[in-house]
Amino acid sequence: MSEWDYKIFWDEAVNQFKEELAFSIFSMWFLPSKYEKSTENTVYLSVPSKFFRDQMIHNYKNGIEKKLFELSGKKISIDFIIKPNTSEDLSKAENEGGNDKKEDAAKPSSAESKKKSVKTEGGRGQHPDLRPEYNFEDFVVGPNNNFGVNAAIAVSTNPGSAYNPFLIYGGVGLGKTHLMQAIGNKIWDTTKLKVIYVTAENFTNEFVECVQKKMMPAFKSKYRKADVLLIDDIHFFQGKVETQEELFHTFNELYEKNKQIVFTCDRPPAELKNLSQRLKSRFERGLNVDLQTPAYEIRYAILLKKMEKHSTKIPNEFIDMVAKNVSSNVRDLEAALTKLIAYTELTKKTMDEATAKNLLRDIFGSTRQRNVTIDLIQRTVADYFSISISDIKSKKRTKSFSFPRQIAMFLCREMTECSTTELGNDFGGRDHTTILHGCNKIEEQIAADPSLEKIIHELRNTIKENTNK
């Protein structure tokens, strides 16, 4: 089979995936994956990063190989070449890929090696306002943030075209700033685009100072000439009428020029108070994604990832202790891990369980929420959908009952430490595979339906409020 034949089969596979997949998924993963070359029975695709490659291998490699077999009648393997996009590539429309021009290169995962290797596209060096350790490779992905991470990668791969504006919201310490700056770092490292990162507070302070010093032309020029504008913590703009007015006009000018705009917020835009409706509508115009509290397994993985950066290693039993007792956010997980590492390094003593619990008692005490029970979640979901708890636990399969039941399963798995077997017992004697199926079903629907994401967010808030009563 000639290389041309392999290319034809790949192009046809892409066309079929375009018909079969949601456009958001197709544009996120298949448009940036480009045919590079082929050898006997292997097709090589270029992808923009190591993280992107790993996700393609995990989620799509088997499906692609199956599709190629169906088309060609031969077993064809897929392999990946990492080629960070050039600015020329990024300027092309979503329906056209173009060829990459850089040599194969994988991004280093550590902040130190990243600092040494970011001289790309003209040797600009590290962005002065972005932290190098905030990159996609160091971001632990799980069901609580998978949709947001995938969308962020799409934005960084095709700024101004994929999702614009792009807004990331969620509670304190869940990775909003990390994800935003990862977008900025990726674009800065791989293109010549002008990237501006600013907190909403600093934007406001700078605006006030420029008004007082009659320097507004310079202020407008700075922000309206950005190719990528990243504004962190936009909830700070609440009640800042004049700043909102300036941001509104800055937004419009950048949006009309197809410049990428990214925001973070501690809540959905609809819940912001004292914010002009027209600005709120701008925030909601593009894609809004919610970063949720990580489940136990993801908290454990985050701690292991953080520990990679330290020479001192903490025994897994204490990592498990932290993951089980700190469920609030990533920042608190880091604080607990840092305390254990500091004790080990400074005292040179072997840590035992009693010592670890004593060291972390303040963190455990301040972050542990009052118990969220299965019963509370079931009651909250039942009330929301105007059904009874017995309906939630019943074997009824009509959608009016099965859908709320699966949402309750999803929230129980996220907000409690109960095993799937325990959850099955409290959901009418179901086995653990039924619980997993229900949770997975909701995760898939959240990724495809933003309105469901809002329902989950509202239920989660109601449950948390009820635990504090």
Curated annotation (Swiss-Prot):
Residues 345-469 are annotated as: Domain IV, binds dsDNA. The keyword Signal does not apply. Residues 1-83 are annotated as: Domain I, interacts with DnaA modulators. Disulfide bonds: none annotated. The keyword Nucleotide-binding applies. ATP binds at residues 173, 175-177. Residues 129-344 are annotated as: Domain III, AAA+ region. It is found in: Cytoplasm. Its main location: cytoplasm. InterPro entries: AAA+_ATPase, Chromosome_initiator_DnaA, Chromosome_initiator_DnaA-like, Chromosome_initiator_DnaA_CS, DnaA_C, DnaA_dom, DnaA_N_dom, DnaA_N_sf. Keywords: ATP-binding, Cytoplasm, DNA replication, DNA-binding, Lipid-binding, Nucleotide-binding. Residues 89-131 are annotated as: Disordered. It comes from the Bacteria. Induction: Constitutively expressed, part of the dnaA-dnaE (TDE_2786) operon. One of its GO terms (biological process) is DNA replication initiation. Oligomerizes as a right-handed, spiral filament on DNA at oriC. Plays an essential role in the initiation and regulation of chromosomal replication. ATP-DnaA binds to the origin of replication (oriC) to initiate formation of the DNA replication initiation complex once per cell cycle. Binds the DnaA box (a 9 base pair repeat at the origin) and separates the double-stranded (ds)DNA. Forms a right-handed helical filament on oriC DNA; dsDNA binds to the exterior of the filament while single-stranded (ss)DNA is stabiized in the filament's interior. HAMAP family: DnaA_bact. This is Chromosomal replication initiator protein DnaA. The gene is dnaA.
